[in-house]
Amino acid sequence: MPPKKPAPAAANKKTQEKKKEKIIEDKTFGLKNKKGAKQQKFIKAVTQQVKFGQQNARQIAAAESEKTKKKDDKKKELSELNELFKPVVAAQKVSKGVDPKSVLCAFFKQGQCTKGDKCKFSHDLSLERKCEKRSLYVDGRDDELLEKDTMENWDEKKLEEVVNKKHGEAEKKKAKTQIVCKYFLDAIENNKYGWFWVCPGGGDNCMYRHALPVGFVLKKDKKNEEKNEEEISLEDLIETERSLLGANVTRITLETFLAWKKRKRQEKLAKAEQDMERKKADFKAGRALGVSGREVFEFRPELVDDDDEEADDTKYAEEDYNYGMSNQVEDTEEVQDIDIARFIPKEVDNAGITVASADRFTAKAPPTNDIDDNKLSEASGGTMENGEHSEDQTLEDGETNEESEAVPVDENLFTGEDLDELEEELNTLDLDE
């Protein structure tokens, strides 16, 4: 027996994946950017068939879950290694305007900080307590109560109490000064002040006072008071204005209202006339600054007929409507009404009128035997005068007619025998020839 052929070497995984991707790309060419549900479903089915073959959906889901499980295991291993060997901590970055002392040093937390007191970040582990998760050994209700107790719910007494508790001891240690810290005032005005607020100007080491002076009123409280003072109801405004009028006033009735309205209208018309006269005087004086185009033509109507290069030659004349209606030009042309009696049919006199015969369409015209030469001469106008034949031509025609009538006609030209012979020839005639 001949030796068996060796089995082909298994292809590399990468080459197989490339082949599969090539097949998927060919089958789904032009469908990747389609958003339709059918196209997406088809693409998903093709990729599943090419990559996994005829596998069951459960097998595919199990394979995916194994992959995710492996990834999670790798992450856990990395986190354990980091905890054991304490890798290099990334440099801390603080946003602008934040005090570095209010942020816990990441190197100190890992036990790697070598700067000591020179470190710009805080080495107080209690700072992390404000942002860390709940601990089983710490009662979180104390902090929760303080977090809920914000400045929005405080009055002036509560605010003074919080300030004294928070900054009372530190204020006693500081040098005597009456200047209030601007950061402290900004925090109070913008509702940022609270139990966990830290002064950006140095915290407890700030040289300025963190306490409100006696009789201090916040800006927002001032604005609220001004708004309340300015807000007056319409009824109160009417009553105050009525009280200021006094007793010697005219009561409003229909008659007084109509008289007032008439007076106001007359004043308005008089004012309009005064304005028009003033504008007219200004226009005549050459001050046409506040005069409109319509008023210009009202003051000087002759400007309508003025022409320039782009205007037409039409001239417009001013006309009074009533005068034009009274002096209309009367039309002198006579007009006759339509009389129906004119359209009654009447018998017409046939004297001097040629009437065509009734059988002119059925009757045949007499045969003419004109010679072509005569026709040519007629066409050229030789023997025809004013549509009538000359006497010579009529004589010639008469002679020709006599000659044609004198020709003898053989009536027995085609006898019965000749016709029979003609029929036989037609029957025996070969059409193919």
Swiss-Prot record:
Q: Where are the zinc fingers (C3H1-type)?
A: 99-126, 175-213
What's one Pfam family the UniProt record gives for this protein?
DFRP_C
**Cystines in this chain:** none
**Which protein are we looking at?**
Zinc finger CCCH domain-containing protein 15
Q: Where is the signal peptide?
A: none
**Organism listed in the record:** Danio rerio
The family database entries (SUPFAM superfamilies) matched by this protein are listed as: CCCH zinc finger
Where does this protein have coiled-coil stretches?
57-86, 217-288
Q: Where is the composition biased (Acidic residues)?
A: 393-405
Subcellular location(s): the record lists: Cytoplasm; Nucleus
Q: What is its main location?
A: cytoplasm
Write the lineage as a comma-separated list: Eukaryota, Metazoa, Chordata, Craniata, Vertebrata
Role summary: Protects drg1 from proteolytic degradation.
* Record-level Gene Ontology MF annotations: zinc ion binding
Per its UniProt record, what Gene3D superfamilies does this chain match?
6.20.400.10, Zinc finger, CCCH-type
- Which GO terms of type biological process are on file? cytoplasmic translation
Q: How does it assemble?
A: Interacts with drg1.
Keywords, A to Z?
Coiled coil, Cytoplasm, Metal-binding, Nucleus, Repeat, Zinc, Zinc-finger
Disordered: annotated span:
1-20, 358-420
Entry's Gene Ontology cellular component terms: cytosol; nucleus
